[in-house]
């Protein structure tokens, strides 16, 4: 019963979180967005100490249920491992005990903590579990999902139905796509062969929670008086943490999947209070008190350091002709969405899960290929602009990189300023009248003034009122000049309230 309950809850969480990344309408986030906000690393970066405390207490009481139920990357590994067992039934009992690779676990955590505190997010986000799953879902699963949607839309259109509508199918930048494919391939290979190897060797969140789970009140426990040492529980343990020979369980690696309990035919393994007479399981390799103290210090450094860092920073047209996209302008200062407060706050808090990219209905947010903010979202106005009436990205960010803003608040936030390059303007290059930027500016920050001040009848060119401009990018997106637009938006380091 415990195993079935765990599988049901894991299936619910995995399905809902995956749908958050696949949903291009933005309708599911109002109901399911909280599932993204309870992921551990985003909660730490968002300074959601209540959620962090709840997850820590839950781990101390129940063990690593976060890894077996809530973490989508962990459940993905379980699905891959399950398929292997179903396809090759002789390998259903393929697991065996292996000593903990402590040096690798602590090396990865030791690499993770300082890089997180120093703001080297690219290195951190390559191994962060929620970030990794987000990239896999956005760059691998989502394009397949959208292709299926477009096929249904094509069929529906033939029968005069509008139940579906077509949407753009795109993948991230080449570095992001490569990182997603490599991560998925590596995780697939490890899970296919060894179950939860990634969680217990590479994943820093697994190592942190493993420290707490060593002292969990409830856990699978072996009754040595009943145990016949048949080895079935060990062969079903995807965490490779059960040593049948010695009757020991390494609780720092146990993900509380309940497979051992379900497999044992003698009732020798039960989920019980570890400190009752029933429980005779030793702590295996993780029993040394010195290791426990070092582990708590390392975990505490991550939580306290990240929280302090976050606290300090918080003070501070349709047509029939082919349309050629404009070349990306070289901005001196990148753009960050409204609600991110500043460029630094955005880059330091973003976990690159790319949930905002999936949610953006205007195709403004795309993964960055720049080294300093690799795989984090960046704003680009070649396919759309940041509409003042849209605040979806601020509502779905689980890490506090983009904080919630209302529609009214967004209209008063200046994220950038439009800059005019008259050398590219079609008024000068082609000698035609335009004014497209001024007509579509939602803030009325652009006016058309005579090219020749002494001749009121001369062609007019755009002039930007920097105090009114909010940096939405409508002017840049709709400018007809090619290959470079005659107007583009430069970001500002710290957002201003108008």
Model feature map: region roles:
Residues 1-247, 252-253, 259-498:
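Non-ligating segments of multi-cofactor redox enzymes
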């Amino acid at each position: 019963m415990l195993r079935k309950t765990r599988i049901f809850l894991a299936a619910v969480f995995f399905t809902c979180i995956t749908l958050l990344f696949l949903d291009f309408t933005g309708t599911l986030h109002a109901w399911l967005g909280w599932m993204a906000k309870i992921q551990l690393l985003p909660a730490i970066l968002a300074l959601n100490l209540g959620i962090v405390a709840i997850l820590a207490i839950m781990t101390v009481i129940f063990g690593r249920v976060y890894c077996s139920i809530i973490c989508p990357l962990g459940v993905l590994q379980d699905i891959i491992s399950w398929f292997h067992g179903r396809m090759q039934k002789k390998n259903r009992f393929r697991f065996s005990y292996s000593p903990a690779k402590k040096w690798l676990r602590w090396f990865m955590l030791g690499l993770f903590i300082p890089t997180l505190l120093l703001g080297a997010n690219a290195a951190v986000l390559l191994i962060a579990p929620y970030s990794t799953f987000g990239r896999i879902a956005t760059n691998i699963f989502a394009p397949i999902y959208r292709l299926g949607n477009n096929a249904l839309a094509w069929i529906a259109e033939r029968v005069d139905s509008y139940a579906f509508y077509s949407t753009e199918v795109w993948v991230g930048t080449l570095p992001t796509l490569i990182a997603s494919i490599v991560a998925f391939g590596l995780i697939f290979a490890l899970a296919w062969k060894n179950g939860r190897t990634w969680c217990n060797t590479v994943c820093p969140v697994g190592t942190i929670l493993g420290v707490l789970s060593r002292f969990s009140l409830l856990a699978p426990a072996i009754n040595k008086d009943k145990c016949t040492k048949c080895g079935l529980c060990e062969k079903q343990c995807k965490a490779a943490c059960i040593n049948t020979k010695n009757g020991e369980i390494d609780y720092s690696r146990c993900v509380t999947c309940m497979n051992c309990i379900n497999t044992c035919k003698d009732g020798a393994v039960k989920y019980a209070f570890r400190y009752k007479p029933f429980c005779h399981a030793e702590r295996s390799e993780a029993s040394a008190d010195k290791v426990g103290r070092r582990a708590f210090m390392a975990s505490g450094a991550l939580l306290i350091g990240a929280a302090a860092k976050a606290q300090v920073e918080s003070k501070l047209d349709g047509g029939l002709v082919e349309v050629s996209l404009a070349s990306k302008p070289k901005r001196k200062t990148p753009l960050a969405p409204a609600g991110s407060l500043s460029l630094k706050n955005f880059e330091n808090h973003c976990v690159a899960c790319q949930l905002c990219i999936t949610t953006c209905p205007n195709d403004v947010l795309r993964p960055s290929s720049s080294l300093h903010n690799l795989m984090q979202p960046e704003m680009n106005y070649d396919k759309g602009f940041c509409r003042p009436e849209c605040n979806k990205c601020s509502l779905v960010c689980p890490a506090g990189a983009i904080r919630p803003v209302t529609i009214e608040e967004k209209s008063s936030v200046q994220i950038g300023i439009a800059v005019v390059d008259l050398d590219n303007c079609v008024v000068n290059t082609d000698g035609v009248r335009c004014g497209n930027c001024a007509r579509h500016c939602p803030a009325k920050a652009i006016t058309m003034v005579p090219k020749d001040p002494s001749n009121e009848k001369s062609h007019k060119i755009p002039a930007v009122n920097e105090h009114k401009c909010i940096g939405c990018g409508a002017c840049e997106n709709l400018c007809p000049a090619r290959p470079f637009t005659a107007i583009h938006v430069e970001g500002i380091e710290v957002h201003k309230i108008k």
